Amino acid sequence: KPKIITAIGMFYDLEKPNEFIKDASLALDDKGIFIAQLMCLKTMIKKNDLGNICHEHLEFYSLKSLKYLFENNGLEIFKIQENDINGGSYRIFCRKLNKGSIKLNEGNILKAINNFVKRVKKNRLQTTNFINKKIREGKKVFLYGASTKGNTVLQYYNLNKKIIPFAAERSPEKWGKYTIGTGIKIISEKMARDLKPDYFLVTPWGFIKEFV
């Protein structure tokens, strides 16, 4: 039996998480470790990460829900690490269920979610007001990065090709294509620079250190 099983960057995409964890528990050596890396609800709320709510993310786990999920299927959480991957993630270490998971305290999640909704609405208003004001002044606003998560923000903010004509993108396979639902044309970074935009709206903000 394997001594280590990993689930990296895919745990929130699972259609049947209970079945997956139960199978992992059965397959794991009695002294083995199951490691899951995933974005959690706490991080999403703290950083106002609206873009995390996209088509491929089927679940958004609080630590309390993860504890319940793992313990119901034969595993317990014994260690949690936080990192900056994808704008902020958890690396969760589990073992066969014995004494129960470590104490996990997140505070009032429902209150945090309600505050998250208010902040997202405020961000939308501030961002769209700023962009529309600059366009009225004759400025050009482009996107930087045609990211999957960015599509959620663009659609919720109602930022389409009439407002933002182009998205600068590093990946050649995306050039000449369009953002989903908003129809913004994706071009190379060089082409975007040649057009001399006044502002870039960064959508893959979780990787901003790599290109600023």
Regions found by a protein language model. Give the residues of each.
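A conserved beta-strand element that flanks and buttresses the S-adenosyl-L-methionine
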Residues: 3-7
